[in-house]
Amino acid sequence: MRKSSTSSVSTYSEPVILEYFLQQFHSRGGTVLYNSRDMQPGDQSEPEEDGPEPFDSETHLRILDVQERRPFGHEVHCLSEPSMHLVRARVNDRGDLSNGSRIEANSDVLGPLSEIRHRDLSASANGELTEAIIGVISEDSERHLGFYNRANNLSLKMHAFQLLPGIGKAKALQMVQIREIVGWSKFEEVDEVCGINSVRLLAERYVKEMEDATQSTRLLDLLVRSEMRTGVEPWMTWTLVS
């Protein structure tokens, strides 16, 4: 016999439902980040120690844009150093902040940093980005020059130099032949013998990787960020296919 649709339905509080879910989840071998006690309202247990913040290793910020923040105040779009993350922050004290200025990452004039996607940058910030990256490369030239001195074949048909804008297979082969074993000690040497603007080409490649996170070979990770994550010198973990 079919039950009446008006029959009463038992209701359960959220803690009971959560406890049941956790029991079922664990019975199937699952693991969760929090147990039911952690999720109870009003829990007075001691919080776990916070891990390192994502931008703890950053020392400076290059201001790409200062813009009004609704309903009031300002925020900045920045490029961090040395890892070259795109970040934003609330402005506590505008002072002399302007496009192109460089400040310490832990400066009190800014609030906490948060990452921003390239597509969410303001038009002004996007226009400043390449020059800001060139500035970062120039400040830490040895790290970035390593690309020109150690780049190898990515595959049987493609050399890493071909990741740079405008560099084709013939030009890449020419650069490899010029480099030989000794390599270069400064960017100016690369420019003179190869007829390129080595810093700008590298900066433009970095911008492309920021625009498109799906790039399979990311020089930003290989050259810049791997050391920040692992403490290993750049290039020691970059093994390209020859």
Name these PLM-found stretches.
Residues 3, 31, 140-163, 177-242:
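C-terminal extensions
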